[in-house]
Structure formats: C-alpha cells, structure tokens
C-alpha cells in the first residue's frame, strides 16, 4: 500500500489498529515534556520543526521513511504518567477540603474516566483522520479555526503550567532561603520576597536555558518531576502521622516560636474544639467548591503528549496504547487520591491552595520538608524552559512560518513569553486562581471539547445516530457545560472577593 493511501485507510472499531497504525508514516512528534525533545528531524533547525503545522504538510520537509516504534510498554506507561502528573497535585488537598472526601472521590473518578475516554476518542480520530499531531487534527476537522483552537488551548495550558511552576518558586524559595540562613525576622529583606525571587530565578536561570535552540538534556528533567512528586507523596503520608490533631496546637506553637502570635492564631486556638477540627467531612459545599473540578481537570491534562507517545510505542496499536493509558491513569488516580486524602486528613480545614506551603505555616522548619522543597524547586525550575519551547515554536510558526531562523526574533518571543508569565505570577493572588482559570478553560477544551469535536467531524464511517457519535456529542456538550459553568462561578467568586476586599 502506498504512503499516500495510508491516511485514507480506516480500521474497523474492533481492530487493534492493524496495518494502519503499524505502517503509518506519521514521523513527527509533538514536543510535549520529554517527548518534545526526541524529534526525528535531527538535521532540521529546532526552531523550524513545525509545532503548529501549516496546510503544506505534503512538503518533503516533513516526509520521512517509516520507522517502527521503539519505546517499550513499561516506558510508555512511565512517559504518559509523567505527562499527566504536575503541579496540580499540590492543589488536590485544597480541593478535597472544599468538597469533602466522598464528593472529591466522586469527582476524581468521573474526571479520570472522562479523561481516559477522551484519549480513546483522540486515538481513534488520529487513525481515521490520518494525523498524529493535535493541531493538524484540528486543521483537518475545522480548517484554520480548528487548528487555532487546538494550538491556543495547548498554549494556554502550557502557560498555566509555567505559571504554576513559578508560583511554587514564589511560595517555596523564600522558605528555603529562610531555613538555610536561619532567619527569623523577615521584614524588609528583599531576598525573602517571593516576587523578587521569581524575577531573579527567571532572569538568571530560566531565561538562559530558554534561549537555547535545542534543549536536549533538559527533556530528562520531566522524569525528575515525577520522581519528586512521588517523594512528595511519601512525605505527605509520613507527616500525617507526625503532626498532631488538632493542628491549632502546632500552629500556635509555631506562631509563638516565631514571635508573631497573631489574632488569627489565637482565634483558632481557643474558638474551635478538637472534635470539630479532627472530624473528616464527606460532603462540603462553599464558595471554594467551584474550584474542585477545574483543579482536577488541570491535573489530568496530558492529551497533547498522547499522540507522540503512541507513535513511539513499540508494536503500536490502538488497543495497546489504551492499555498504556489505563495503567497510567489508574496509577495517577491512586497517587492523586492518596496525596489529597493524607494532606486533607493532616490539616482538615486549614489546607491552603498549595499544600507544600501549608506545612511551613503549620509546622515551620523541618529538614525532610526542606529536602522536598529543594527537590521540587529544582524540578520545576528546569521544567519551565521545556514548556517554553513548544509555546515559542507555535508562536513563531503562527506569525512567521516561512522566515529563516533569527536570534533576535527568537529572543524577543522568549522574553515576551517569560515576562508575561512573570506578570501573571506577581499579580495573580494565588495559585488557586491559575488552577481554576486554566482548568476551566484550556484543560476543559483539551479533555472534553476538542477530542469529541474532532471525533464527530473526522470519523466518517459512523453515522451521527450511532451510539459512538451520540456518546461523543454528549461528551462535547458536557464539556461546554463544565467550561461555562466553572468559568462563570469562578468569575463570580472573584467579583465577590473583590467586593469584600473593597468593603474593608
């Protein structure tokens, strides 16, 4: 069968992907996290590897000979798990504290199942549509509008991820410096100001790495991120059995040691009972409950990485890739559940939007937590340049796809992206707002709306009245409801907070 015929080869729903997926000439990997840096076009300028493919995909530049996948099943599971896990895990205890244990587990189960279903839709659409690139599926389905929707959603998600990483630097680096230098009085010290430190880290470390034309070895830092999060989970579980309940006692002790015995600490110490403080709640509804679904969707986004991982899978087939996805999603489901549960059962109603920061408020300085902070800081700092790379390339090929590489343009785009992200981190009040907004918008698009919309448009052999198409349509509508509903409630919460702040 000729290569030109492969894109029109339709596999049956029951086939494993047969000759089509095993003989695809889809040789381009979308660079997301670790997969981003394993391009098959080593001889092509990295900035010319088209992250946002144009309509001229037939050019020889993107045609290579067929290559079989070389990544083992186990390593594919690791890569996909690595693509799923991220900074969102730090906000899950906050989500549980504002939904209750039972409601959180229900929401976590539904979001994980829906995310897995969208992977199924995406894989089937890729086979039927003849592309292993997310943006190109959008272009084939809806032309320029579809391509821009996919590219815009991926870019927003990446900017959200970058912002959350820099928020971690803003929250945690001052605490690390304070602990290492044994500083108690933090008034007026610029090097303990999170905003200054974010700018300094961005200028001294992140910007030089981001200006590289080929990030190469930094691709392995995404694996470091997964290991750091596993270490973080182990520490969260251990600390549950070391921190007393109610945590008010530890909070007051910490406040007393630091010489800042605040009115809030006094109120917590004397106006709550141990029974109330240490009793888990199973269903909670308050103004912060609305952030639960966006935080969960933000935590499960991995879909731009699914197709390149599928392409690299040894003996690749759709069924085999779905098995990879099921194992990865189940592993992350357990990891997220344990992190959220033990974080919540440690602090109950005192959980902050970034769990690691909660420990410093309640426990104070701790060697084990200091090691966790250092590991997480190193991981997120080295991951930011990896995330910038596909954003910059998408912008470059959107604005000037035919121009030769220019260091000036390369530098301006990089500085602009990093500056914009720094402004978000400095002026957005909390990481919760990043999780909420990106989770309700870009993550909802990538999980719910785009895979189902592409499936409905590109899978021609199934009529609209078929069970599969009706299911995809319902999935699409549910995604629209989730996005509009979550965004609306989040905006209302922002307005309420602004009004309350103005009233004082």
From Swiss-Prot:
Region of interest called Disordered, as start-end residue ranges on this chain: 1-23
Q: Where in the cell is it found?
A: Cell membrane
Membrane topology term:
Multi-pass membrane protein
Give me any GO biological process, just one: regulation of glutamate secretion, neurotransmission
Disruption outcome: Placenta-specific Slc38a2 knockdown reduced fetal weight by 11% at the end of gestation.
Q: Which residues lie on this side of the membrane: Cytoplasmic?
A: 1-76, 124-158, 210-217, 311-326, 390-410, 455-469
Query: InterPro entries of this UniProt entry?
Result: AA_transpt_TM
Tissue specificity as recorded in UniProt: Expressed in cerebral and cerebellar astrocytes and neurons.
According to the UniProt record, one GO cellular component term is: dendrite
Its recorded reaction(s) are: L-alanine(in) + Na(+)(in) = L-alanine(out) + Na(+)(out); glycine(in) + Na(+)(in) = glycine(out) + Na(+)(out); L-serine(in) + Na(+)(in) = L-serine(out) + Na(+)(out); L-proline(in) + Na(+)(in) = L-proline(out) + Na(+)(out)
Keywords on record: Amino-acid transport, Cell membrane, Disulfide bond, Glycoprotein, Ion transport, Membrane, Phosphoprotein, Sodium, Sodium transport, Symport, Transmembrane, Transmembrane helix, Transport, Ubl conjugation
Q: List the disulfide bonds.
A: 245-278
Where the protein is mainly located, per its record?
membrane
The record's region (Regulates protein turnover upon amino acid deprivation) falls at: 1-96
- Activity regulation statement: Inhibited by N-methyl-D-glucamine. Inhibited by choline. Allosteric regulation of sodium ions binding by pH.
Binding annotation for Na(+): 82, 383
| Segments traversing the membrane | 77-96, 103-123, 159-177, 189-209, 218-238, 290-310, 327-347, 369-389, 411-431, 434-454, 470-492
Q: Glycosylated residues: list them.
A: 254, 258
PTM annotation, UniProt:
Polyubiquitination by NEDD4L regulates the degradation and the activity of SLC38A2.
Modification Phosphoserine, positions: 12, 21-22, 55
Cite a single GO MF annotation.
proline:sodium symporter activity
Function of the molecule:
Symporter that cotransports neutral amino acids and sodium ions from the extracellular to the intracellular side of the cell membrane. The transport is pH-sensitive, Li(+)-intolerant, electrogenic, driven by the Na(+) electrochemical gradient and cotransports of neutral amino acids and sodium ions with a stoichiometry of 1:1. May function in the transport of amino acids at the blood-brain barrier. May function in the transport of amino acids in the supply of maternal nutrients to the fetus through the placenta.
Q: What is known of its domains?
A: The extracellular C-terminal domain controls the voltage dependence for amino acid transports activity.
Give the family from UniProt. Belongs to the amino acid/polyamine transporter 2 family.
This chain's protein is named Sodium-coupled neutral amino acid symporter 2
Tell me what organism the protein belongs to: Mus musculus (Mouse)
